[in-house]
Amino acid sequence: MATTHLLYLHGFRSSPQSTKARKLEARVREHRPQVHWWCPQLPASPRAAMDMVMQGIARWPQGAMAVIGSSLGGFYATFVAEATGCRAVLLNPAIDPARDLGGYTGEQTAWHNPGERFVFEPHFVDELRSLRRGPVARPENYFAVIAKGDEVLDWREMAGRYPGAKIKLLEAGDHALSDFDRHIEEVLAFLDLG
């Protein structure tokens, strides 16, 4: 079934103003204006973020929705895809954010607006642990774009988390996927936008 509703989930300290989110939104609005696009600003609390997302998509047609997530958003996208059975595209997805973000508790600045501050509370690490899911139920619903040159996350761990999924392993690249323009069409083709 073609995707009629598309959710984009940004990463830690990121926002709907990320380069990837803006490029995807522009492409969807230009070429598939009938597709419902939603890229919310996620709260710092993982539990609050997932509660907001799950409420926001509660009336979406599960067979015709998809999710894209970058970094921590990829972890969240896996949670959403496992809960709904939808397709998911993961862009350098975080695999164990409870481990990786444990050292980032306290006040943080927003990546796209350094004047904006938020607090990443210690108990948010436990919330991340509670959102972790086991092996994915339907690996054919997943497409991961993973850069071996990611300076933040281990590409081997990312690739190993999604056995049986479609994986595009980039020989170089970086965590931000600075060459994302080269991958947009493949991402959107996987999602079969209606």
Q: PLM features: residue spans?
A:
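Short, conserved beta-strand segments within well-ordered enzyme catalytic domains
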Residues: H36-W38, A66-I68, L90
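Gly/Ala-rich beta-loop-alpha elbow adjacent to hydrolase catalytic centers
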Residues: I68-A77
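Active-site catalytic motif of lipid deacylating hydrolases and related acyltransferases
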Residues: A2-G63
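Active-site phosphate/pyrophosphate- and oxyanion-stabilizing loops and adjacent acidic/basic residues
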Residues: R22, A26, T78, R156-A159
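Internal catalytic or translocation cores that form aromatic/hydrophobic pockets or channels
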Residues: R59-M65, C86, L91
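Aromatic pocket-lining residues of Rossmann-like dinucleotide-binding sites
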Residues: V80-T84
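Short hydrophobic segments within beta-strands
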Residues: Y8-F12, I68, V145
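The alpha/beta-hydrolase serine catalytic core
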Residues: R87-G194
